[in-house]
Amino acid sequence: MWVEADINRIRFFWNSGPVGMIQHDDFWDLVCQKVNVYRGDVSGTTTNIINLDDGREIPTDILLCGTGWDSTYRFLSSTQKVELGLPHKPCKDSDEERRSWSELVDTADRQILQQYPILGRPPSDCKPIGGAGLTPARLYNGIASLTDSSILFLGRARMSNNFRGAEAQAIWATAYLDGNVTIPPLKQAKREVAYMNAFSRRRYPSRGVDGLNFHTDLVWYTDKLLCEAGMRSHRKGWWEDPDEPCLASDFEDCKEEYMAVYGSKQGR
């Protein structure tokens, strides 16, 4: 098995590399016995050889490419992406819009560095991954367009527990579409979005360039969504909440709570 990796570049605090969950007890035993790690870039392949850019040749029977996924919404026009607040080329913004967002992000950035000075000193090898040349996503809570209340974008934000994140986003989206959540006035909403974008970029300099990385901010993020939806964010009890992991199963009774708060005709 051939694996391209660079363990030295991965730092958990800065989330500079992908993070996974060990699902099997024998995972590391299998890796240490069966996996050879080669660090480098692929320059080409032949019938049964992978060529690296440093001249090494790696015999192989099969090559698996983990190419990621495309979140560019190809079915939307470039104009629609700008209007909805999805990542787009800055040149598509009007001069006034570009200047307004730049001022908001700069203000948020100064506030963040004043409050968290360490974020101004990331490792030199934490380079942005993806999103080069595009604006960040300008979505309230990483979900809602600031200009069109009829559409939401779920699942774009990256979190350390996507199951919990998905549950919280679904609850917030239900309340929003039911009319039980309203986003702040536009000026305030833009300030909050700019802060979220700037924080994502500073906190996660490699993977936060699109403004939607909440990897170690999972609990804050899901608490915010539930509170805005009028639900209880602390659901286990005064002792268990600070002492036990936050899981998707914490929200298992949210449907009943939602109907109790807003009525049985909603939240279906």
Residue ranges of each PLM-predicted region?
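N-terminal FAD-binding dinucleotide-binding subdomain shared by FAD-dependent oxidases/monooxygenases
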Residues: M1-R268
